[in-house]
Design a protein with these regions (language model features):
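Short acidic alpha-helix initiation/capping motifs at coil-to-helix transition points
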Residues: 1-2, 71-75
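N-terminal intrinsically disordered, cationic/polar leader segments
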Residues: 1-50, 57-61, 101-135
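Secondary-structure capping and boundary motifs in well-ordered enzyme cores
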Residues: 45-46, 68-72
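Active-site- and interface-proximal helix/loop "cap" or "latch" segments in soluble metabolic
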Residues: 73-108, 115
Length: 135
């Protein structure tokens, strides 16, 4: 999804309660990872919740999937998938996720721990993209 489209979608939602509900709904639509994929190697460090991210073996575009034990975090994973999955590794590396995060208004609306976890997920996704690009 184009970042501007996602920002527009968020702006259509009036209150933060509606935006949180939207994130939760996005998370509910996220396909779960298998038990085998929810392992230490795929775990994202720096998140208060349990978070796992995996990527398909495709050097030309990053297709990643993720899961968490927290509803809002699952929504944030879904949001990152919408923005970053399906792009080339170089596009993933170049995306200014911090700017998008701020423009979505999330910077001031989620806890510092959750924000740190969000950026830990972004770094893990970028690492997965770099691994795919390196072959």
């Amino acid at each position: 999804m184009d970042p501007e489209e996602l920002i527009d979608n968020f702006e259509l939602l009036g209150s933060w309660e509606e935006r949180y509900q939207y994130l939760i709904e996005l998370g509910k639509e996220l396909p779960p990872l298998s038990e085998e994929e929810c392992n230490e190697a795929n775990r994202v460090r720096g998140c208060m919740s349990q978070v796992w991210l995996v990527a398909d073996d495709d050097p030309e575009k990053l297709i990643f999937r993720g899961d968490s034990d927290a509803h809002i975090v699952r929504g944030l994973i879904a949001l990152l998938r919408m923005l970053m999955s399906g792009r080339s590794p170089s596009e993933v590396q170049a995306m200014d996720i911090g700017d998008i995060f701020s423009r979505l208004g999330l910077e001031n609306q989620i806890t510092a721990n959750r924000r740190n976890g969000f950026y830990a997920m972004v770094e893990r996704i970028r690492a997965l993209a770099a691994e795919r690009a390196a072959g």
